[in-house]
Curated annotation (Swiss-Prot):
TM helices/strands, residue ranges: 7-23
Keywords: Membrane, Transmembrane, Transmembrane helix
Topology in membrane: Single-pass membrane protein
Protein name: Uncharacterized protein HI_0389
Amino acid sequence: MKGKITLFFTALCFGLTGCIAPPKGLEKERFSINSYREISPQDLTCHCKTVRLGGKIVNTTVLANQTKIEVLSLPVSSISAKPFVELQSDGRFIVYFNGFVEPENLKERYITVGGQLAGTEKGKIEQADYTYPVVQADKYRIWTLSTTYDYPTDDWDEDDDWGFFRWRHRLWYVQPEIHYYLN
């Protein structure tokens, strides 16, 4: 009986771990660079490093045989490969996909990209000149931003009025806690 319980909990742990596994092909171990901050000038010139980067899609341009995406870089989770939505951006980078990717499907979405670092590209962010690292993508995963609202629990024993006259005592609106997550 004890062996069955141990087996059950072991299977449960593996099952729960599978829920947070990165998408196939975007595992951290497959890439030599896993953060925008890890990119050095030598990496940009050698064209030999594999990278896994992520962030918010800012702009999409469809070219003749490929699609160009400008991404606002965000740190990526080492476990699930999802970009951290609430952290500050590291910079921007450009991703090239072979073939056509519908630009409307990418608006206001987040992405994790795995591919080859392919040098730099000059561009502008409004009036400022900017040098973008360029990634030729092999694998990618598009994420959708979802929102949850957590309202504080209401303590019924607070005033012993069972909530009937609570509106007299509470003249303000209780703000919910807003949580953002990617799925």
